[in-house]
Amino acid sequence: VVLIDLRGHGYSDKPRNIEFYDFADDIKFLLDAIYIDEAAFIGHEMGALIAADMSVRNPGYVSSIILVNPTSIEGELPEERLFRKYAHKIRNWEDDKQEKFLDKRRYYKARKMNKFLKHVVDTNSISTKEEIQAVKDVFKSEGIADVFKHVQVPTLIVAGEHGERTTTLEAKEVADLIQHSEFNVYQHSSAYPFVEEQAQFTQETTNFIHQHAPK
């Protein structure tokens, strides 16, 4: 398993200007460097766009893709849409109170997810505002969601039933854009099905990857 800090994320380089196609190019460069000539890809939320783009631009490298809570809505990030939905009510609240309110709308079980997230390193703390904004800007680019309708590789889409960062409706809209995709809703999940229903996610995704792996 290769877990990648994409350009602008984590401990990777953080240029002030990023183009959407840079992500797939970086992934291909890394795979070549470590002698991986084919792989299955899992992309979460906006990362689903990158997995889709990788499959379209480098089909020979991709045996299948798994998209978790994908969305085809452009121009605004999921977290921004969630805040805007309730801004009339919470915009003047203190930050802690805002977060508690939004957590109840992000997660199926907010306490469980916050416990998990405490163990996730916040690499944004080592990024400047300009570097963080560069990543946000690339995912708000017009036209990037067009990539979904060009996907040809086997595709599994997983959506959490609960939470408002992204919705099952948004995920289903992506599924409708990808011919012959499989669509699964996890009934006890929200933003992170791979954590909230880890055993089911691991089993189903492993089976899907093996089913479409090169013989």
Where are the regions that the model predicts?
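Catalytic active-site module of serine/aspartate enzymes centered on a nucleophile-bearing elbow/loop
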Residues: S181-K215
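Alpha/beta-hydrolase active-site loop signature
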Residues: L6-G10, S72, S190-P193
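Conserved serine/cysteine hydrolase catalytic core
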Residues: Q133-D176, V185
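Flexible "cap/lid" loop of the alpha/beta hydrolase fold
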Residues: A52-R57, S63-W93
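Conserved alpha/beta-hydrolase catalytic His-Asp/Glu region
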Residues: G75-R81, W93-H150
